[in-house]
Amino acid sequence: IEQGAILEKNELINSNEFDGLSFDKAFEQIDKKAKKLKCGQRQVNYRLRDWGVSRQRYWGAPIPAVKNSKGDLQGAEDIPVVLPTEVKFSGVKSPLSEMEDFTKVSLEGEEFIRETDTFDTFFESSWYYARFASFDNDKAMLDERAKYWLPVDQYVGGIEHAVLHLLYSRFFYRCLRDLGLVEGSEPFLNLLCQGMVLKDGSKMSKSKGNIVDPNEVIDLYGADTLRLFVMFVAPPDQSFEWSEQGLQGASRYLNRLWNLVQDHLDSESKKELDFSDSSESVTTLRNKTHQTLSKVKDDFLRRHSFNTAIASIMELTNAIPKEFLSVNAKDFEKSSVREAINTILISLSPITPHITHALWNQLGNQNIIIDV
């Protein structure tokens, strides 16, 4: 206490009958006593915010309401409200407010003005994932296909959405559930919150002037190099500092991979892959190849640890003996190299699709590598 607050969940002290209890047990006992004394109860508090409607576009979701001459609001009867497409932009306010044929509404002999505000992008983003399942249905929000495809197996988004977008999405999904349009209560089965790319220790921002233009990087290094660097430098859920040295390292590896395939093509055996008579060094390389394939599959699909998957692929690249690339290498040695290279290219193809596809075709494969 004298040195600082105890931050860990530990045993309670100076708490009367709750002394000595662990945090979790004390929590349960205090909850029971509070209920018995009718002085409190357990409650979950969400970080709810008023929906600050912003980022509006005139073509956003219409607000189905009209105002009478007194300014009183009431619900519009002509639902859904269909927005006009022929509009003129003044650059000052919504073009809808200038269109009398849209704004003026007559209901039972009384004149009303239609609400010209629209909901913001959060309204659409709260259920867009569901609409993908019925994207071509212009008669309804969703159809039976939504029940097949939803809920979303894996959702990726920034942690900043935890108190806004992700909560709204759950509200919308449960509304869709109550309408019988989807099944279940949760829209996303798994969530991955990706980290940020930092520059000079802070989030990239135009106002701070620390932006790195990806187009300039692609022009200099190529898209595959940029993709490899971003996926290799850190786990996807952690932020990382932009590094020109790291980018150059990714470029060097891809150049090395290209040269590796060219060396193999120069020494390649035209025979079918045959390992019936192989040496201990061939067995070692083959074991490394299959271990890498198993690890990459687990890192990609279960752990979402792309950086460790790439590290394993690089280790396999380093494990190929130089003598196996010689013209004088034995056929089963060349076969083990081909097996290792195939594994490297297939494993890297989701990360660096362009160079791996080109090398895959150079090896005589006619199919598209991403489909292998």
Regions flagged by a language model, labelled:
Residues 1, 96-99, 104-236:
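Alpha-helical recognition segments enriched in aromatics with Gly/Pro capping
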Residues 1-78, 87, 208, 213-246, ...:
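Residue patterns forming the tRNA-binding/recognition surfaces of aminoacyl-tRNA synthetases
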Residues 1-4, 13-43, 47, 86-121, ...:
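Basic, alpha-helical terminal appendages of large translation-related enzymes
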Residues 13-16, 33-37, 144-160, 211-215, ...:
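Glycine- and acidic
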Residues 31, 35, 127, 131-134, ...:
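Amphipathic, well-packed alpha-helical segments that form the structural scaffold of globular domains
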Residues 35-42, 136-150, 174-187, 220-221, ...:
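Secondary-structure transition/capping motifs at alpha-helix termini
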Residues 51-60, 252-260, 282-323:
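Core structural elements
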Residues 65-75, 80-81, 191, 197-198, ...:
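Acidic, turn-prone loop/beta-hairpin segments
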